[in-house]
Amino acid sequence: MGQKVHPNGIRLGIVKPWNATWFASSQEFADNLDGDFKVRQYLTKELKKASLSRIVIERPAKSIRVTIHTARPGVVIGKKGEDVEKLRAGVAKIAGVPAQINIAEVRKPELDAHLVADSIASQLERRVMFRRAMKRAVQNAMRLGAQGIKVQVGGRLGGAEIARSEWYREGRVPLHTLRADIDYATASAHTQYGVIGVKVWIFKGEVLGGMPAANAVEPKADKPKKQRRSRK
């Protein structure tokens, strides 16, 4: 059987940034790593209904800075910033250093693999037909400018006795092209018949020289050659 490498992991440092950017000595590295894991766990639990996309952690000079990427920033902030202040105190307690929380809004949630996978999983838990949920996600992504999308679900689909997997794809999803900006995420739907896994790949275009291929200068086309008249 063919094995597939993780689409995000293989592109780190090429077209994908890291979710944690800090340096530490060998004595502090394990503690920082454990702290990052616990902070992510805490924020994911607290922000279940906030359409959380990703959490970026930085550690400048004995402090921690957390950037929360979400499609619903109002839910994270709360009334007069009460909720975000509560989160800041919780993160500072877990990390053991002063914390700062920034919130970044995801403008197009239909093009974010994490949000699409979570949306499909929540629909499956509400007993929406899996084919309808998949096709709706694919159509929304293509409508908003994705160059390609693939969605796969696996498990006891429709309550079947035997588990199987089905997928639906539209456009291009070039997994072997390292300069391709591919967003990948997974989610789990806990249904009455068991767990259904959801995988989403979204191709947003190629990155050439640090900028999207759509903005790159196209090479000039050669002038058409004049045809010689045949001698009679």
UniProtKB/Swiss-Prot annotation:
It comes from the Bacteria. GO terms for biological process: translation. PROSITE patterns: KH_TYPE_2, RIBOSOMAL_S3. Pfam families: KH_2, Ribosomal_S3_C. Residues 39-107 form the KH type-2 domain. Keywords: Ribonucleoprotein, Ribosomal protein, RNA-binding, rRNA-binding. GO terms for cellular component: cytosolic small ribosomal subunit. Part of the 30S ribosomal subunit. Forms a tight complex with proteins S10 and S14. HAMAP family: Ribosomal_uS3_B. This is Small ribosomal subunit protein uS3. It comes from Aliivibrio salmonicida (strain LFI1238) (Vibrio salmonicida (strain LFI1238)). The lineage of its organism: Bacteria, Pseudomonadati, Pseudomonadota, Gammaproteobacteria, Vibrionales. The gene is rpsC.
